[in-house]
Amino acid sequence: GKMIADFNNVEESVHKNYTTIKDGETSIGNCQINIYLWYDSYFGDSLTACRLSMYELDKKKEGTNEYWYKDPNAYYTNIDPDLYYDKETSLLGRKSYTAVDLSVSDSIRNLSTYTPYVKITLDKARTEELGKELLKEGRTKDLYKKFQDIFPGLYVESDYGDGTILYVNAVQMDVAFLEHARDSITGAKLRTSLGKDSVVYAGRSFTSTREVIQANKLENGTKIEECIDRKDCTYLKSPAGIFTEVTLPIEEISNTLGSDTLNAVKLSIPIYNEATSDKKFGMSVPRSVLLIRKKYKDDFFKNNELSDGIKS
């Protein structure tokens, strides 16, 4: 193929999609950065117009001077994302979307290998800033170890539309770039037969794994307070909603049935479905409810425990 020696004078088709990256006055490559949110399913209206804003968590928390991932309290649903990013300077991009992307043909969407996604392409300024660090560190063996300091994390906020929930299962950053071809051992630039610098297409992918924490911030409307204040009944709303406490009269049962032998005890809690609703889509009643002893509730979720029939 055609080799490009001058990063400032690339082909028009490349120039439209790639940003020139400079280290000082020297051009070191052309770069494009895309961030994907992959989801396997959704809840609600497939065609409701929604919008998300994506921010880099590049702000260190006041008092500790550390990024969010060093804060042990940052992994709970009451996390305050505002402590770790700036609304004006940390914006990576915004994207309008629907759960079912009609711009993708039916033949593609119906493939068993197709996974829907929402994509954000970083603008020129952000690409220059992040691309410079990645291109400079890209030739080192420990790039992935350094990545956390180069890009501490991202925060995605749903700021328009409330008719759809995406069940995101993976986040991926793809960095595609043109750079000088270099000797794999010496690191020296390779040249063409005409003596010009050789340029190659290359890329890096940074994909979330189990070790990459996905913390969810959930906020409830003011109407939830009406449910909390009711005295004739209680509600269950999870996660980050209403957590009802049930007190079991163990002492009273013991005093009354202390001399009896019980093989099994059944706990029954009657539930009532909402009779009417103005919502087009409603979640079905859960098939089971998790009961956890109060003193064990924090450890249960922190340690990813399963119900054992004793503590939960």
Residue map of PLM features:
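Secreted, disulfide-rich extracellular signaling modules
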Residues: 1-312
